[in-house]
Each structure stands twice: as structure tokens, then as C-alpha cells.
Amino acid sequence: ETVTLNNGVKMPLIGYGTYQTPPRITERCVSDALHIGYRSIDTAQCYGNEREVGLACQKSSIPREELFITTKLWGCHKYADTLRSIDASLRRLNLGYIDLLLIHEPSGDVHEIYRAMETAYRDRKLRAIGVSNFMPERYLDLINHSKVVPAINQVETHVFRQQRELRRLECQIGTKHESWSPLACGQNGIFKNPELSRIAASHGRSISQVALRFLVQQGIIVI
């Protein structure tokens, strides 16, 4: 199942994340994920495993156009160094283009960083651009200083942290919401929660399935 971003690009509703996956096992993990049906793979510059993600995708028999690769910028401050950073990710992934590029967090001169992303987007190096960990105030500030509306805002979102205000804003403006840590990092007693346990039992499902369904049923993309 896919969702359509604000520029018409289709993105899988569920993706495989590589956070805290050491480079030495990333290629195997991503290959396994692709083998069982994942087509959306999420990485980041600060994860240190872009190259291995790219290798797994290259070695698979899956056509490039069926894959959706997300990565995130880290440590950029100005326009020029952001352009260089984008090109470095393109080289490491070695997949021709990046499907979705995000600002990993609202630090540095986000207006200059995003302006460079808009340039790379116009140059067709990127199919879509967006942000990550932008709360309402920072999100609205970026919107007011950009030409391209972010396609995605990837934020910690789960049954215990639903981000309702942020999601309302994004819906009004045209940005899709994406969840990282959809199972709350296993915290807050999620796997023993009485209400989730009751719902899971009544539907013959696991708590994990219920927690994920809670998100995807609302059109929230899940990593």
C-alpha cells in the first residue's frame, strides 16, 4: 500500500528503518528486508550505513523504480555545504537518485539547508524533500521561508505520543506525517498495556499489530 505525496510521488506506507544497524550487518539486514517484501528503506548520514543500504539495493533483483530510499542530512549549516553533503550521500548510496531527503533535525540554518535541498530537487537529484523532528513552531517557520512545501515530516509518533496538533497543521498545509519509533521503543509498558492487550485479544492480533494499525489506518507512514 502506498500514499501519494504532495508532488504526486508515491511512497510505501510501511518502511524498514536502519537506525542503530551497524554497517557490518546493514547489507544483510536490508537484503533480508527486501526479500520479505519491504520496498521503502530509511537511512541517514549519521547512521553511517548509507553505502551498505545502497549495496543491498544494487545486489537485489528489484528494479530501482520499485524502491523508495530515504536518507537524512546531518551536520549541515549553509547552502554550499548542504549541496556537497547531498552529493556525498548520492555517491555513497550509488542508486542514481534519492527518493526522499529530509533535514534530520532543526539545527543549523534550516532555511539555507532547505534552499539547497530545493535546488537539488529541481535538479532531479531528489524525488521529494522534507523534514524530521520539526515541531509546530519550527515547521511553520520553515513553511513561511520556503518555495517547496515539505512532502514529509518524520517525527516520533505512537499510541502514547500522537502528535495531534502537528498532524492537523501538516494536513492543512499538505505535508504527510511519518512515524519513527511506532512501537514507542518498547517503552511505557506498551507490550503489557491493558487497553492494547484487550484490543489485541478481541481481534486475534498482537499488540504490535494493533499499535501499527492505529497509525497506518490514519494514513500515517511508518518506519
Question: Which residues fall in each region the model found?
Answer:
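Residues at the N-termini of beta-strands
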Residues: 40, 97-100, 128, 152
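Short, acidic/polar
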Residues: 21-34, 77-93, 112, 137-140, ...
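Acidic-and-aromatic substrate-binding clefts and catalytic sites of carbohydrate-active enzymes
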Residues: 21-24, 42-52, 75-80, 106-111, ...
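Alpha-helical scaffolding within the catalytic cores
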Residues: 1-3, 51, 55-58, 86-87, ...
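Beta/alpha (TIM)-barrel catalytic core signal, keyed to glycine-rich beta->alpha loops juxtaposed to Asp/Glu
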Residues: 105-223
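A short, structured active-site edge motif that brings together acidic residues
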Residues: 64-77, 99-106, 133
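CE4/NodB-like, metal-dependent polysaccharide N-deacetylase domain
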Residues: 82-103, 119-123
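N-terminal binding-site loop/beta-alpha segment at the start of enzyme catalytic domains
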Residues: 1-67, 183
